[in-house]
Amino acid sequence: MHYSATKRTTKKIQKPIPSSKTASNRMKAAKPRDTAPEKALRSELHKKGLRYRIDVRPVETLNRRADIVFRSAKVTVFVDGCFWHGCPKHGTQAKANAEFWRNKIKQNQARDAETNQLLKKAGWKVVRVWEHESPGKATEKILNIVIKQKAKVHK
């Protein structure tokens, strides 16, 4: 049998067993895309006349997907959930399987930081929006960044 010289080093994390039927339903309902905060932000961006791609890789060779991408301006937007990404204001600590969730959130934060670094290195502007942020305020921030970036990219 022949094996590739490159070997995947990504560790598979064992999913925790839900502590209750309610927890099980909550875990099943968690979506990787098209969340309510994402939809609200996209709606506001669209009202301002901004056009974008959703759930795409900004850099094809990079195995990371952004929630919203403005290709011509080289701007990526990630809408981070307070629980999943450890929001300092609204992030909550899980009571059941606490150690698993602490590690999971730390890994998410490390991946977020690495993603930011890799995209910046590739010439992209990275914007992170917490799910609790006002879609209107986030839209204004993103609009200003897109305008500035388009001016830089199209010089």
Q: Language-model segments: which ranges?
A:
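Nucleic-acid endo/exonuclease domains
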Residues: H2-K155
